[in-house]
C-alpha cells in the first residue's frame, strides 16, 4: 500500500481543518501569490501610488497587453499578484460592485466598502465545497475623503497599510519601505520610492517592465504614469541603489496569520 502523508486527508477538501487549525488549500493559494510578480503600494499625504513588476517572458509579447494595474472606478485602482486569471475575476467583480453602488446611491463607492465585498467573496471560497480559494492577492488603492491602501489576502482577510508589497519580492520591498517611508511624503516622492523598491527586486529593471499608476487627492482620478516618467524615476532609483546598501531583511512579511 502506498504511503499517504498525514495531511493528505485535509488537502482534499477546502472545508476541512487540519488538527492544528489550518486550511491547507488557503495556504497553497498564498504560495501562488508568493510566486507571483511583485506589486507595491505607497500612500502619501496627497495621494496613493501603485506599481507592479511586469514579467514579459518573450520579446514577441506586446508589453501594453500585459496589464497588472486595473482601474476599478474613477477614484479606485487595484494591482494584482498571483494567478492573473483569478485576479481578473476579482477585478471584474469589484467593477460591478462599484457600478451598483454608484447607481444605487448616486455617489462613488467608499474603498472600505468595496474591499469588504471583495474579501467576503474570497472568504466564501474558503468555506464551501466545489470551489477553491482565489490564488491572487490584490492591492486596492483609492481616494474618497483621504488616500487609502489595502491588501487583500486569499483567505478573505484584509489590512490597511501606509506602504506594502505582495508577490515574490515582498520581503525586500518591505525592508526598503521600513527604512525609507515617511508620512509627509509627496506624491512624486512616493512614486520614486515605489520604483526604487521594484528596481531592487528586478534583475534587469526597465521602463517597459514597470507599470505605475497614481490617484491624487486633488483630482481623485486614476492616472497611469507615462513610460518617460517611469524612466526618469528609474534612473534616479538606480543611482540611489548604487550609492547605498539596501537594509537587510529583519522581518518576514510573507504570511500574516491574523486569521487565527
Curated annotation (Swiss-Prot):
Q: Which InterPro entries match?
A: Ntn_hydrolases_N, Proteasome_alpha, Proteasome_alpha-type, Proteasome_asu_arc, Proteasome_asu_N, Proteasome_sua/b
Q: What is the activity regulation entry?
A: The formation of the proteasomal ATPase PAN-20S proteasome complex, via the docking of the C-termini of PAN into the intersubunit pockets in the alpha-rings, triggers opening of the gate for substrate entry. Interconversion between the open-gate and close-gate conformations leads to a dynamic regulation of the 20S proteasome proteolysis activity.
Residue span of region Disordered: 241-260
Keywords, ordered alphabetically: Cytoplasm, Proteasome
Composition bias of kind Acidic residues appears in: 242-260
Q: Which residues form the signal peptide?
A: none
One GO term in the molecular function aspect is:
threonine-type endopeptidase activity
Q: Where in the cell is it found?
A: Cytoplasm
- Pfam annotation, one family: Proteasome_A_N
Q: Which GO terms describe its biological process?
A: proteasomal protein catabolic process; ubiquitin-dependent protein catabolic process
Q: Could you tell me which PROSITE patterns the record lists for this protein?
A: PROTEASOME_ALPHA_2 (PS51475)
> Could you state one GO cellular component term attached to this entry?
cytoplasm
Note the HAMAP family from the entry. Proteasome_A_A
Assembly information from the UniProt record: The 20S proteasome core is composed of 14 alpha and 14 beta subunits that assemble into four stacked heptameric rings, resulting in a barrel-shaped structure. The two inner rings, each composed of seven catalytic beta subunits, are sandwiched by two outer rings, each composed of seven alpha subunits. The catalytic chamber with the active sites is on the inside of the barrel. Has a gated structure, the ends of the cylinder being occluded by the N-termini of the alpha-subunits. Is capped at one or both ends by the proteasome regulatory ATPase, PAN.
Q: Which NCBIfam families match?
A: arc_protsome_A, PRK03996.1
Tell me, in a sentence or two, what this protein's role is.
Answer: Component of the proteasome core, a large protease complex with broad specificity involved in protein degradation.
Record family assignment: Belongs to the peptidase T1A family.
What's the protein here called? Proteasome subunit alpha
What organism is the protein native to?
Answer: Thermococcus sibiricus (strain DSM 12597 / MM 739)
Recorded name of the encoding gene:
psmA
